[in-house]
Amino acid sequence: MSDPKPTRSQGDLAEMLEMLLDKGVVVNADIAVSVGDTELLGIELRAAIASFETAAEYGLEFPTGTDMERVESAANISPDQSDPASETQSETESTNPLSDDSTPTASTSAEETK
């Protein structure tokens, strides 16, 4: 009898990771721990996973200290395209497939912050 062989190659994982970072994905998770009818613990998780280049294209928020010039040059976008204050809410909603109503993004307009 022959030894079992893996059905997946390492290339599959690399390709999947490349696609995930290239396209991006939003993770929404609601976790509740209950005993009977009493909820003891509730966790709401909202996360966007994407490469810096993809996140810059869609206007997602970056951590403090991120070298924005490097991100903008890697994503081939101009600084005014990545500035969230320069976008309107309608432009953001129509061009941002990574976000939904419950997912926070950096693309807030000046009208939203007032």
UniProtKB/Swiss-Prot annotation:
Pfam families: Gas_vesicle
Region ranges (Beta-strand 2): 40-50
Gene inactivation effect: Deletion of this gene prevents gas vesicle formation.
Compositional bias ranges of the Polar residues kind: 75-98
Compartments it resides in: Gas vesicle
PROSITE patterns in alphabetical order: GAS_VESICLE_A_1 (PS00234), GAS_VESICLE_A_2 (PS00669)
Region annotated Beta-strand 1, chain positions: 25-35
Top-level lineage group: Archaea
Annotated region (Alpha helix 1), positions in chain: 13-22
Keyword vocabulary terms for this entry: Gas vesicle, Plasmid
Effect after changing residue 20 to A: Makes no gas vesicles, decreased interaction with GvpL
A molecular function (GO) term: structural molecule activity
Effect of residue 13 to I: Very few gas vesicles, still interacts with GvpL
Principal subcellular localisation of the protein: other
Alpha helix 3: annotated segments: 78-87
Region (Alpha helix 2): 52-72
Induction: Probably part of a gvpF1-gvpG1-gvpH1-gvpI1-gvpJ1-gvpK1-gvpL1-gvpM1 operon, maximally expressed in early to mid log phase. Gas vesicles appear earlier when grown in static culture, possibly due to O(2)-limitation.
InterPro entries in alphabetical order: Gas-vesicle_GvpA-like, GvpA, GvpA-like_CS
Biased composition regions of type Low complexity, renumbered to the chain: 99-114
Any one cellular-component term (Gene Ontology): gas vesicle
Miscellaneous remark of the record: Encoded in a 14-gene plasmid locus called p-vac which produces predominantly short, spindle-shaped gas vesicles during all stages of growth.
Family indicated by similarity: Belongs to the gas vesicle GvpA family.
Annotated function: Proteins GvpF to GvpM might be involved in nucleating gas vesicle formation. Mutagenesis of residues 13-61 shows that almost none of them can be substituted and still make gas vesicles. A minor component of the gas vesicle. Gas vesicles are hollow, gas filled proteinaceous nanostructures found in several microbial planktonic microorganisms. They allow positioning of halobacteria at the optimal depth for growth in the poorly aerated, shallow brine pools of their habitat.
Family annotation (PANTHER family): GAS VESICLE PROTEIN A1, GAS VESICLE STRUCTURAL PROTEIN 2-RELATED
Quaternary data: GvpF to GvpM interact with each other in vitro, and may form multi-subunit complex(es). Interacts with GvpA1.
Protein name in UniProt: Gas vesicle protein J1
Organism field: Halobacterium salinarum (strain ATCC 700922 / JCM 11081 / NRC-1) (Halobacterium halobium)
Lineage of origin: Archaea, Methanobacteriati, Methanobacteriota, Stenosarchaea group, Halobacteria
Annotated gene: gvpJ11
